[in-house]
């Protein structure tokens, strides 16, 4: 065990992870990363803390997914959103509707027509294919275009793609599990939040804890209930129950009734591409969010390459610091000499 650089305790049971970490720490593992569901262990006055078990880093899947969902709510016209350089740069995915002014035009033409919008089209996801576009690549209907841009240009890039930016005010969450409760607690001060929970006991219990959230004791798949709650007036619907089939069905149902933004949470990645094709606006997985957190922690410790993975496209985003002794650069390159298998999304120089 002393030769182990990292011990990753990633089971779904907190107690098993704690014991594994303690044994690994006792046997001399250099670094220990632990996955925990219960966020109470992070509280200052917690009886049990990660430090007591020799844990260096803790990853909370629900918390990671919560952050991703909140980012999507702030930019509701996007289906994927990742931040770089402490939020100064963003990579966002936008699905192109038939009415998008980009359809039928190539990348070079769009760049020439919009010289004052700083952006880079980094990736296109088209059906089951993900590829790096070229200057003559034409945009097609239902393409998911991934743009890299400064945060200050978010509204401009969405307008360029034919999306009308709108602000979310009314949010409905289905499922009062860990993720649903955390979202409601975080969002209730800034939005009008309603949360649906079919378990009467649980609904009554969380109703006492969420003072600014309307807790609805009902079945989120009941059409009569949804119409009585004027579901069509909801700006955002988040399907966050523990059953991903229920989440998928609920998402399709409310999308049919005209909810502007539907965010679906699923555990596995099997359904990602399928649900995107049938009209779900954004898909989030707490497991993928947790994987990203683990990768960032390891890369950060090694001062190596921070890697961001995306849920359903075969692309990684890498942040590379170029120095005189950089082991990844053996010779000088110009942009024209780069392989077609990757592109440079942005360069930070002198801040």
Annotate each PLM feature:
Residues 1-351:
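Cytosolic regulatory regions of ion transport systems
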